[in-house]
Amino acid sequence: MSIIVNQIVLHQLVKTSQDENTVQLKTHLRDELLPITAETEQMMLQLHQEYHNKTKAYGVFQETSNFAQILNRTLENDIDFLAFSHQSAELLRQELGKYSFANDGTLILCQYNFLATDYLFIALLDSRYSMLVDENLEIKQTHYLDITQFDIACRINLTELHLDAKSTRYLTFIKGRVGRKIADFFMDFLGAEEGLNPQVQNQCLLQAVSDYCQQADLTKEQTQAVKKQVFDYCKGQINVGEEIVVRELSANIPTLNEQSFVDFAVSQNYGLEENIPPVRTALKSLTKFSGSGKGITLSFDAELLNSRIFWDEATDSLTITGLPPNLRDQLQRQTKE
């Protein structure tokens, strides 16, 4: 798959001083865009792929967003991309300086096209140090731009923003490993607030599937069979990197009480999006029971309940018949010691 880079530029944020709560940063700005070469396109393709694999949250611009105003002026050709990047770098410097975790970094802004969709990608990348051997077989220190490990990044789907300004998913940003501060910082920089919540959408989907089966008075086995079909479809979408298409999902499961699943979901006002980003951990509950606590971790297929695994609510206990062989072997070895 190819990527078409339309405009790209790099700037740097340099830390000059730091006190207990804030950091002083300055910007080092390029005065022209980067030339579009095979190297820049290869770098952007790798950044695109790395970003795709990261855990992301969705956002939408607030009405008072300074960043959105600058972006709109750029899209309307009131200012060029270089001027947009300079103003964005200054906004980022001001916002990032409020946080103690702020550090030096290379700011990349790129407008590109991938699979007939226009994107704006923004990331703050770290530089790493390593060693190299030169032509004289001498060892020297070098530093390079780390385009595989980054936490401060966002991407705006410009095509979706243009076609549907009320969309709740045109903006995504990385949910950083260092906690809420990264998410809060980037939301403030962008002037954005939470948009689509994939976890909530997945939970609503699961509830809709459960209610759909219940209103049709299906048996336990029939209900589990429908849930297995739903899970198989969703798992297939995850495997190919696609979203759950509710209408497509509906076509993959039986019509109950002469009403398709998609029509049932709409009539009951579950608030499901037409396309839903799948959350693997949430979808597992379609076919499995799982939980952990007090030193115990359990996970088993839902179809085993009341066949090999029995729950006694009164005594808050589970009875398991037919232990997994590897678990039985561990227990036998332990009792012999």
Curated annotation (Swiss-Prot):
Keywords annotated in UniProt: Cytoplasm
Recorded GO CC terms: bacterial nucleoid; cytoplasm
Broad class of where this protein is predominantly found: cytoplasm
Example GO molecular function: double-stranded DNA binding
Domain of life of the source: Bacteria
Xref: InterPro entries: Nucleoid_associated_NdpA
Pfam entry (one): NA37
Subcellular localization, as worded in the UniProt entry: Cytoplasm, Nucleoid
Family indicated by similarity: Belongs to the YejK family.
Protein known as: Nucleoid-associated protein HS_0228
Organism: Histophilus somni (strain 129Pt) (Haemophilus somnus)
Classification of source organism: Bacteria, Pseudomonadati, Pseudomonadota, Gammaproteobacteria, Pasteurellales
